[in-house]
UniProtKB/Swiss-Prot annotation:
InterPro entries: FAD-linked_oxidoreductase-like, Proline_DH_dom, Proline_oxidase. GO terms for cellular component: intracellular membrane-bounded organelle; mitochondrial inner membrane; mitochondrial matrix; mitochondrion; nucleoplasm. The lineage of its organism: Eukaryota, Metazoa, Chordata, Craniata, Vertebrata. It is found in: Mitochondrion matrix. It comes from Homo sapiens. Keywords: Acetylation, Disease variant, FAD, Flavoprotein, Mitochondrion, Oxidoreductase, Proline metabolism, Schizophrenia, Transit peptide. This is Proline dehydrogenase 1, mitochondrial. It catalyses: L-proline + a quinone = (S)-1-pyrroline-5-carboxylate + a quinol + H(+).
Length: 600
């Protein structure tokens, strides 16, 4: 039973705190006070006043940039906003390489797109840029931006091969799998319709080991240049995605069963943390479905685990999955509508079990190295058919490594309809079990792909209906987490956004809640080459801000550069403002005779 053997390796050595208690923990945890200021000394240490942040002051926003860098930024962002050029950018790159030769082509790219969006070719060559950014208050999240250059056909073949089990290939697997959690040829190339997110395709276990080594080098490099660094990882880089698909389906169906029982008990439409099932009624339903005997059911729901409330919430129900499902023998999930237990697969092969265990071991190696180097590990969100498993495995790492402070950060995609439920459930779980909550909030990178897949395959669109609804969801999630930070001195969050309104909202709520930037508990993040008018004013005002910094050889990061160009096309409103500010600063330097400005 691979899951039951492997997950304990990610559990902390300290005792778990009442994993099935339905009594909500008090929100009143130690508040963040003056003593929380790094290096602040006594509890009566006085924080410095918070400087005002002006995102419209072009002179301050770009005082770290030389004039030729401003001109390059203006050129690149203008080209990225030219639809006709973007539509043919791959052909233009190919022709340029043929006409110029490799050496001149590399120079051209370093003078333009590569120089704007990529820090350098290796960890040594990027050091001057990292030091320069730190001098102006901006830190780095390192990412080795090299991608495998696969044709669409090669990507589709790899995806279908790695997401389909041996049992499904030979016809012995069940046909009752949820189609949302099955691989489909039409969406085999996961790069389609995706911007800003790197895509990994499974080749073999050796390739996964290679990805792990790359992440380890990033951790070491980040630890050398900063005592407050981050790196981002993707779990699809660390193992066969078949496991993520199947485990996601288990978790989704387990959660769906809980909500179906909630409907039966007249609690439809309630928020996740407000739904409380009567245990006696739930026991009756479980017994009728034949999921377990009466004796087993009574063993599940005891006074010791449930306390005196007589009710069970979604966290309590989810915690049962460790011991009630057997992934490697005969995994069954209850279907309340049919009244049947549905097997997902007959069994994992020995090789599949080993591959799953290796994925978890690689995660553990990275988390231990990050802990050793004092670097925070952000686990990136991915497609919704992988995400339940990714979030659950991240949670297991948080239980083990977030004991004293948040070293492992989960990512929450706020374009999802269930984003708020996901955030509130995890915050409450951290409270109950006593570990430190760490989160990165993003809008999401897979919108077009997710919508197209849901429409084509035939399941509910998981994405919020409008851009405004996504903004509202982001602010709702952020507000909830900031409220938690007010009462919990060990929780932290990264506001990963290029939206000025969202950043202003975060700053206003921080001021209202008494969250000082010197506490280093609210971080801000943007991509290298984008929204410097947000990043540098924040950094210069003392807020902890990070640039997502890719690096790698020119030819091997071209797929990354293609996405950066396409992303700027999709963010026309934001880049228009950025181009305006760049023009203002260039004209100011021209008028004042300061074209040879030296950053200081």
């Amino acid at each position: 039973m691979a899951l039951r053997r492997a997950l304990p390796a990610l559990r902390p050595c300290i005792p778990r705190f009442v994993p099935l208690s339905t009594a909500p923990a008090s929100r009143e945890q130690p508040a963040a006070g003056p003593a929380a200021v790094p290096g602040g000394g006594s509890a009566t240490a006085v924080r410095p006043p918070v400087p005002a942040v002006d995102f419209g002051n072009a002179q301050e926003a770009y005082r770290s940039r030389r004039t030729w860098e401003l001109a390059r930024s203006l050129l690149v962002l203008r080209l990225c906003a030219w639809p006709a050029l973007l539509a043919r950018h791959e052909q233009l790159l190919y022709v340029s390489r043929k006409l110029l030769g490799q050496r001149l082509f590399n120079k051209l790219m370093k003078m333009t797109f590569y120089g704007h969006f990529v820090a350098g070719e290796d960890q040594e060559s990027i050091q001057p840029l990292l030091r320069h950014y730190r001098a102006f208050g901006v830190s780095a999240i390192l990412d080795y931006g090299v991608e495998e250059d696969l044709s669409p056909e090669e990507a589709e073949h790899k995806e279908m091969e790695s997401c389909t089990s041996a049992a499904e290939r030979d016809g012995s697997g069940t046909n009752k799998r949820d189609k949302q959690y099955q691989a489909h040829w039409a969406f085999g190339d996961r790069r389609n319709g995706v911007i800003s997110a790197r895509t990994y395709f499974y080749a073999n276990e050796a390739k996964c080991d290679s990805h792990m080594e790359t992440f380890l080098r990033c951790i070491e490099a980040s630890g050398r240049v900063s005592d407050d660094g981050f790196i981002a990882i993707k779990l699809t880089a660390l193992g066969r995605p078949q496991f993520l698909l199947q485990f996601s389906e288990v978790l989704a169906k387990w959660r769906c069963f809980f909500h179906q029982m909630a409907v039966e008990q007249g609690q439809a439409g309630l928020a996740a943390m407000d739904t409380k099932l009567e245990v006696a009624v739930l026991q009756e339903s479980v017994a009728k479905l034949g999921i377990a005997s009466r004796a087993e059911i009574e063993d599940w729901f005891t006074a010791e685990t449930l306390g005196v409330s007589g009710t069970m919430d979604l966290l309590d129900w989810s915690s049962l999955i460790d011991s009630r499902t057997k992934l490697s023998k005969h995994l069954v999930v209850p279907n309340a509508q049919t009244g049947q237990l549905e097997p997902l697969l007959s069994r994992f092969t020995e090789e599949e079990e080993l591959q799953m265990t290796r994925m978890l071991q690689r995660m553990d190696v990275l988390a231990k190295k990050a802990t050793e180097m004092g670097v925070r590990l952000m686990v990136d969100a991915e497609q919704t058919y992988f995400q339940p498993a990714i979030s659950r495995l991240t949670l297991e790492m948080q239980r083990k490594f977030n004991v004293e402070k948040p070293l492992i950060f989960n990512t929450y995609q706020c374009y999802l309809k269930d984003a708020y439920d996901n955030v509130t459930l995890d915050v409450e779980l951290a409270r109950r079990e006593g570990w430190c909550f760490g989160a990165k909030l993003v809008r999401g990178a897979y919108l077009a792909q997710e919508r197209a897949r849901a429409a084509e395959i035939g399941y509910e669109d998981p994405i919020n209906p409008t851009y405004e609804a996504t903004n509202a969801m982001y602010h709702r999630c952020l507000d909830y987490v900031l409220e938690e930070l007010k009462h919990n001195a060990k929780a932290k969050v990264m506001v990963a956004s290029h939206n000025e309104d969202t950043v202003r909202f975060a700053l206003r709520r921080m001021e209202e809640l008494g969250l000082h930037p010197a506490d280093h508990r609210v971080y801000f993040g943007q991509l290298l080459g984008m929204c410097d008018q947000i990043s540098f004013p924040l950094g210069q005002a003392g807020y902890p801000v990070y640039k997502y910094v890719p690096y790698g050889p020119v030819m091997e990061v071209l797929p990354y550069l293609s996405r950066r160009a396409l992303e700027n096309s999709s963010l026309m409103k934001g880049t228009h403002r950025e181009r305006q500010l760049l023009w203002l600063e260039l004209l100011r330097r021209l008028r004042t005779g300061n074209l040879f400005h030296r950053p200081a």
